[in-house]
Amino acid sequence: MAEGGGYRERPDAETQKSELGALMRTTLQRGAQWYLIDSRWFKQWKKYVGFDSWDMYNVGEHNLYPGPIDNSGLFSDPESQTLKEHLIDELDYVLVPAEAWNKLLNWYGCVEGQQPIVRKVVEHGLFVKHCKVEVYLLELKLCENSDPTNVLSCHFSKADTIATIEKEMRKLFNIPAERETRLWNKYMSNTYEQLSKLDNTVQDAGLYQGQVLVIEPQNEDGTWPRQTQQSKSSTAPSRNFTTSPKSSASPYSSVSASPIANGDSTNTSGMHSSGVSRGGSGFSASYNCQESPLTHVQPGLCGLGNLGNTCFMNSALQCLSNTAPLTDYFLKDEYEAEINRDNPLGMKGEIAEAYAELIKQMWSGRDAHVAPRMFKTQVGRFAPQFSGYQQQDSQELLAFLLDGLHEDLNRVKKKPYLELKDANGRPDAVVAKEAWENHRLRNDSVIVDTFHGLFKSTLVCPECAKVSVTFDPFCYLTLPLPLKKDRVMEIFLVPADPRCRPTQYRVVVPLMGAVSDLCEALSKLSGIAAENMVVTDVYNHRFHKIFQMDEGLNHIMPRDDIFVYEVCSTSPDGSECVTLPVYFRERKSRPSSTSTGAVLYGQPLLVSVPKHKLTLESLYQAVCERISRYIKQPLPDESGSSPLELGACNGSRSGCAGEDEEEMEHQEEGREQLSETEGSGDDEPGSDHGEATQKKNKGRPCPRRLFTFSLVNSYGTADINSLATDGKLLKLNSRSTLAIDWDSETRSCYYNEQESETYEKHVSMLQPQKKKKTAVALRDCIELFTTMETLGEHDPWYCPNCKKHQQATKKFDLWSLPKILVVHLKRFSYNRYWRDKLDTVVEFPVRGLNMSEFVCDPSARPYVYDLIAVSNHYGAMGVGHYTAYAKNKLNGKWYYFDDSNVSLACEDQIVTKAAYVLFYQRRDDEFHKTPSLSFPGSSDGGARPSSSQQGTGDDETYSMDTN
C-alpha cells in the first residue's frame, strides 16, 4: 500500500478514465447505493487522469496525484462525520455508483478514520417516476409513552418502512419482541395519529423532519396506557391535525426540526443511523392528548407549522391564501364543479382538493395554526423537487402550484390543436385578440381568469430586418434587478517580510473583473506591487487553487478563503527565484500499524528561493526564516536531550544536519555534506578523516532539525519521492509541492499555534462600509424588463427569411395585465462557479401602482393596483428563511406570517430588501364577481373596496409555536 492509503497497483490513467467514465453513466435504480465524494478531491482525480478532454495537459504528473479519498470538506463535525447543511450536488460533492466507489477505494484508499458516505436511491412521483439519491436522511425524535422526557434522535431514509422504525425503537427502549406495541405520530402540542400500516414507508406516512414518534407498549393485562386518552381524541380529524390556539408555544419546541436532515455519514447501510443522540426534556411532564376548547381566531390569521425547511412553502401559501378572488372561489366550493380529473397534464384533482382543504382550515376561524402535512405530501408526490426537506424557492413553488391548480381546474376537457400564426404585418390588436382567444380555447380556469396576462414579443433580424411579433400569456412577471457593477471581497495578504503578520483587507473590485483587478486594488491599499502578488484559495490547510492573473473573479465564491502572498520573482542580486508551495504536516504513528501517517495543519506557505541556490540546505534556511515569527523557544525540560538546530530561526547557520533516522532515512547519505562543523563535505564516507569525525561526534547528542522535507502531490496527502541530499541543486519548479514534516513532540515544543493563526486587520476592515444608494424603484425594474436586448450567441433566433439562426434583437412589452399581478423580483443569480443574491432594496408602492404607462395596448383600460401580499427571503441563496406580509381581506389590516407565528404589521415595515415576490390586486369595483371568460384587458370584473370588508378581527399579536 502506498503512503496515504492508496494502492501502488492501480491501472494507468487511460484505464481509470475509461472504467470510471462508463460507470458514471449508470442510471439511478430504486434501492441502489451511491456514494458521496468531495468534489474537490474528485476534480483533482479528473485532472490527474485527464478525465475531461479539455484538461489533458498534465496527465499523470506527480503533483496532481489526488492521494486517498478525502471527504473532510463535507463534514460540519469531523468527529461524528455529520454532513454540512445545504451541500449542493456537483458543486460540493459528486455522486458515484457503488462499483465506481469500490474501484476508487481500491486504487487510492480513503483517509484514515473516515467512513464512506453511502446513500440510497429513492423514488418520487405518482405518474412519472423520478429517482434521486437521498443525500440527507430524515431526523426523527423518538420516545416511549411512559417517559416522554427521554427523547432520542435517529436518522432514517424515506424508503425505510414503519416496521423498520418500530424495530429500532424496540431496541432503543429495550422492549421485548413478544410484547405488543403501538406507534403514534405526535405533532403540534397534543395531537396524535396512529401509524398502523407497518409496511408503509416513511415517505408514504408523510413523516417530516423533526417529527416526534411515540411507542406505546401494551400493559400486562392487555389494556393500553393511552386507551382512555385515545377515546377522548378520537374525534380529531385524520388529516392536518391542529392544536388549540391557547397553546402559545409547543411543549417540545426543544426538539423541533433542525434546518436540514444531516443524516449520519458513518452509516454504511444508508438505512438509518446507528448513533443516537439524546435530547433534554423533549416533552413537558403533562402528556395530555385531549384538545383544549376552541377559541375564535380571526379567519385567515392562521400560522403554518414548519415541517422542516418548509418556510418557503408557508410563505407562498400565505400569499395565495390572502388573494381574495382565489380564496373565495375555494371557500364557496366553486371548485367542486370544475375539477378536471381526466386532464393528462393535471393531477387528477388531488392538488386542488388538498389546497381547498388547507384553505378551509386556515379560514375556519378555529385554528391559530395548522400543520400542512398532507398538502406537502401531495405536492411532493407530483413535484419530486419539493418532496425532501432541503430549502427550496417560494417562487418556484408558486409557479408549480398555480400551474397545478390551473390544470386540475381546467374547464376545457379536450384541448383542440391550434396552429400558431405570425403577425405578418397585421395590427397588434387583431393578433393579440387572436392569441388570447386561442389561449382560452385550451386554457380556461379560475387561475387564467385571475392571474394570466399577455406579453408582446418583438424580434428583429439583424441581417434581413425581418420583424416577428408574437403574443404570449404569462402568469407572473419576473423582473430583473439592475446588477451591481462591483463586489466587496475580504482577503488576507501574507507579506514577504517574515516579521509581519498576515493582514486582512476589504477591497472593492469589478463584479466581472479579473484576478489582476484584485491585485491592483490590494496594491493601492498595501503599497505592495501587484506583480509581486500570487492569489490563492486555501482550503483544509492546502492550496485548493493558485490563480493566474487573467482568470475571472467569478471563479472565486464568496465563501472561499482567499490568501494573497507577496513573492519575489528575483533575489536581491538579480537572479531568478522559484516560488514553491509548502504545506505543514505532522507525522503520527498509526495505531493499527508500525508505519506513520501525515496530517496537514496550519497555513500553507509560498517560499521563494534563488534557482542557482536551490539546495536542501538553502531551502531549509528559507523556510526557517519564513516561519521564524511563530517558532517559540521551549522551556528547558520540554526540548528533550538533543539540542535543536534552528537554522535561520535564531540567526545561526546549520550546526549539524543529522536527523532522526526514522524521520529522514531517505536523507541519511547526505548528512555529512550538509554540515559545516563536522567537515568540508568533500571527504568520502569511508575516509579516515570522515571516520574520525564520526567517532568524535558519536559520544555527544547530535542536533535535530525542526522538520524534514517531502516532495508531495498538490493535495499534500501522498509522498512522491525524496529530495536529493548530495548538495546538488534540487530539480524543483513552481508546480512542485513540498511538505515540511514535524514529529508531534517537536511541533508541541516549538510551533506556536496561537501566533501562527494571529492576523492584523487593515483599516479597511475597521471602517464601516460606505453605503451607496442601492435602492431602486420598481419602475426601474419594469423598464429594464422592457428594454431591447441582443440575443446571445448561445441563444439565437431562427429567422424564417434567412433560413438560419441569428442574434436578433428582442423586446418584451406588456399588452394586458391580470386582476392579480404577481411580480417576481429576480434576486438570485448563479453561474458554474458561484451563486449570489442581490440584496438591493426595491421601492415598490403599497397603494396605487399605476401600470398603465407600461401597457402598449392603446385601448387598454387603466391598470392601477394595490399591494396585498409579499413573500420575503432573508439570507443567501439556497439558505436562509422565508416569511410573508399579507393584508387580511376582512379587516384590511396587514399581518406578518413567520411559519406558525402571526403578528400585526405596519405598512412602513413592508418595503425591505427581503421582498422577493409581490402580489398586487387590481382596483376594480366588481372584483369579487364570478370570474368572466373575457379578454384580460376588458373592463368587466372588479374589486370590492377594502373599506366594505367588515370583520371583527383582533389586533393583538399572535405568538404561536414554530416547529
From Swiss-Prot:
Residues 459-463 are annotated as: Necessary for interaction with RB1 and RBL2. Residues 11-122 form the DUSP domain. GO terms for molecular function: adenosine receptor binding; cysteine-type deubiquitinase activity; identical protein binding; metal ion binding. A motif (Nuclear localization signal) lies at residues 767-772. Residues 142-226, 483-571 form the Ubiquitin-like domain. Phosphorylated at Ser-445 by PKB/AKT1 in response to EGF stimulus, promoting its ability deubiquitinate RHEB. Monoubiquitinated by TRIM21. Ubiquitination does not lead to its proteasomal degradation. Autodeubiquitinated. It is found in: Cytoplasm; Nucleus. Zn(2+) binds at C461, C464, C799, C802. Residues 219-277, 634-701, 930-963 are annotated as: Disordered. The completion of the deubiquitinase reaction is mediated by the DUSP and ubiquitin-like 1 domains which promotes the release of ubiquitin from the catalytic site enabling subsequent reactions to occur. Its EC number is 3.4.19.12. Residues 302-923 form the USP domain. Residues 225-243 have a biased composition (Polar residues). Residues 229-295 are annotated as: Required for USP4 activation by providing conformational flexibility between the DUSP and catalytic domains. The active site is at C311 (nucleophile), H881 (proton acceptor). Keywords: Cytoplasm, Hydrolase, Metal-binding, Nucleus, Phosphoprotein, Protease, Repeat, Thiol protease, Ubl conjugation, Ubl conjugation pathway, Zinc. Pfam families: DUSP, Ubiquitin_3, UCH. One of its GO terms (cellular component) is cytoplasm. InterPro entries: DUSP-like_sf (IPR035927), Papain-like_cys_pep_sf (IPR038765), Pept_C19_DUSP (IPR006615), Peptidase_C19_UCH (IPR001394), Ub_carboxyl-term_hydrolase (IPR050185), Ub_USP-typ (IPR028135), USP_CS (IPR018200), USP_dom (IPR028889). Residues 405-407 are annotated as: Necessary for interaction with RBL2. A motif (Nuclear export signal) lies at residues 133-141. Residues 384-386 are annotated as: Regulates ubiquitin dissociation. Residues 485-775 are annotated as: Interacts with DUSP and ubiquitin-like 1 domains and is required for USP4 activation. PANTHER family: UBIQUITIN CARBOXYL-TERMINAL HYDROLASE, UBIQUITIN CARBOXYL-TERMINAL HYDROLASE 4. This is Ubiquitin carboxyl-terminal hydrolase 4. It comes from Bos taurus (Bovine). The gene is USP4.
